[in-house]
């Protein structure tokens, strides 16, 4: 079965697939930055599992959720902002040198693909209610229908903020520009090589998704390779053929924390009608009971107990059933590197409690799964390899993973993270007159580099302050002071000296309540 790629339009901060009428679908995306829990206590992992279960419970009948995860994000916008602040603020030669070195080094690493930034987006998709137009349809009724859907998406956004914001996560509703950029990057993996300063210049809201973003066809690969060739890259697809037999919080990190870039995960999720599922399971239980009465096989007895437990679990509301489709796509410039990525991904899937990955050998099947993973499009007519799974199990295998970046967008200083990422920091947070100082304590053994770290922060943030005062023991910052200002002289206070720091000095003023 061959399925053609879907098409739609960007507008009013939503995506409309196949028209705003009966048979069409409407979706909106949300960028989610969850708290980084890779090394967190199990208590926090369990809390995230509960939050994700609540997220699934919020899905309405006939609505679908698509989880889009990838690790091919770029740090270029943040680096350009950092560079702009250097040009605007830095006047000291040492500060300029330090900040420029950080910019050039990290820019080169980003271009070489050695930096890694995970991105997570949630798309909520629902069918267009054609009956809402009534017997006549006009511009006013279309605007009213769009307004109703936008309000529903707004409520979903508030729900997501309440769900993940309390744990330190961030949620941002995507705009037309965000939807366009996601599709442009998704369908054009070579975009970062073209050195385009502003991709939004190519956005035309009058054109469809394919006209805006789909600039080439998929060409089949020669055997024994599987997948297809598109936009200068070889693409390979993996789909979970069997899901993990059991799960645990954090099991998805086996897939999301691999040490290479250029692969993504798409999970399409649909709620299941519980009553219909119970009726179906009851019929199957009756059939198995009849087989057991005639054959008396232990295997049939175990199947009876499993189905009876499932019926009881759903009837009591202890869990809720969902159907999911789990798609993994990898791409690379060479076939050899793509094969290596697919092998590593298969091994990671196998480590997820005996899950199995299916690699479609037919180019048609690979393309169909690719079309099923387009952002926001979770109603594909290609229905292969959907699985029934309970809510807690679905929650555990969702790729809810993020890259810790700190205050990257308005960073005063930058450091490299442990997972090929950049972490930004600020000395004050807030807006306007509501700035709050961010106090810090640096801990480490002797020779671990505490002073080196602090000097780097001082060097990068010098341009934000009129002067810097350092009170320390041992003279570790004398070289830094002389480098920033050759005329600076340290004030040395010692036990047998003539200077002291009297914090009780009123400077000749009478005592007051402030003292």
Residues covered by each model-derived region:
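Amphipathic, soluble alpha/beta structural segments
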Residues: 147-201, 403, 427-467, 473-480
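Extended, folded cores of ATP/NTP-driven motor/assembly subunits in large transport
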Residues: 1-388, 394-399
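Short, solvent-exposed loop/turn segments at the edges of secondary structure
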Residues: 115-119, 321-323, 408, 418, ...
């Amino acid at each position: 079965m061959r399925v053609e790629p879907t098409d739609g339009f960007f507008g009013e901060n939503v995506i409309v697939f196949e028209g705003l009428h009966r048979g069409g679908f409407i979706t909106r995306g949300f960028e989610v930055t969850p708290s980084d829990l890779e090394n967190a206590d199990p208590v926090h992992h369990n809390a995230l599992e509960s939050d994700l279960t609540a997220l699934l419970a919020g899905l309405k009948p006939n609505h679908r959720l698509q989880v889009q995860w990838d690790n091919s994000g770029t740090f270029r916008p943040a680096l350009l902002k950092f560079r702009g602040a250097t040009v605007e603020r830095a006047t000291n030669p040492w500060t300029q040198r330090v900040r420029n070195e950080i910019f050039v080094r990290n820019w080169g690493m980003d271009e070489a693909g050695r930096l890694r930034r995970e991105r997570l987006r949630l798309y909520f998709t629902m069918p267009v209610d054609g009956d809402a137009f009534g017997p006549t349809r006009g511009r006013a009724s279309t605007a009213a229908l769009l307004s109703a859907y936008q309000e529903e998406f707004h409520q979903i956004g508030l729900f997501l903020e309440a769900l993940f914001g309390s744990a330190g996560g961030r949620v941002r509703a995507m705009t037309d520009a965000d939807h366009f950029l996601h599709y442009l990057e998704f369908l054009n993996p070579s975009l970062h090589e073209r050195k385009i300063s502003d991709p939004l210049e190519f956005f035309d809201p009058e054109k469809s998704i394919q006209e805006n973003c789909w600039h080439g066809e998929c060409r089949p690969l020669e055997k024994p390779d599987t997948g297809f060739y598109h936009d200068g890259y070889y693409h390979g697809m993996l789909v979970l053929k069997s899901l993990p037999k059991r799960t645990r919080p954090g099991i998805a990190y086996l897939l999301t924390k691999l040490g290479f870039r250029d692969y993504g995960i798409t999970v399409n999720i649909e709620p299941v009608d519980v009553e219909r599922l119970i009726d179906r399971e009851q019929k199957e239980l009756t059939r198995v009971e009849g087989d057991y009465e005639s054959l008396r096989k232990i295997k049939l007895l175990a199947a009876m107990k499993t189905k009876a437990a499932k019926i009881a679990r759903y009837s009591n509301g202890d869990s809720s059933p969902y159907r999911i489709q789990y798609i993994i796509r990898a791409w690379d410039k060479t076939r050899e590197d793509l094969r290596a990525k697919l092998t590593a991904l298969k091994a990671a899937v196998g480590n997820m409690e005996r899950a199995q990955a299916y690699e479609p050998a037919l180019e048609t099947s690979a393309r169909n799964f690719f079309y099923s993973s387009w952002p926001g499009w979770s109603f594909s007519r290609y229905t292969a390899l959907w699985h029934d799974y309970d809510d807690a199990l679905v929650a555990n295998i969702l790729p809810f993973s993020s890259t810790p970046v700190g205050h990257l967008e308005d960073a005063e200083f930058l450091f490299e993270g442990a997972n090929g990422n950049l972490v930004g920091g600020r000395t004050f947070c807030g807006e306007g007159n509501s700035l709050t100082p961010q106090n810090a304590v640096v801990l480490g053994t002797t020779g671990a580099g505490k002073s080196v770290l602090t000097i780097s922060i001082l060097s990068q943030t010098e341009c934000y302050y009129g002067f810097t005062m350092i009170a320390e023991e041992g003279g570790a910052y004398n070289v830094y002071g002389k480098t920033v200002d050759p005329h600076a002289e340290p004030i040395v206070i010692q036990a047998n000296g003539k200077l002291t720091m009297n914090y009780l000095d009123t400077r000749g003023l009478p005592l007051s309540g402030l003292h």
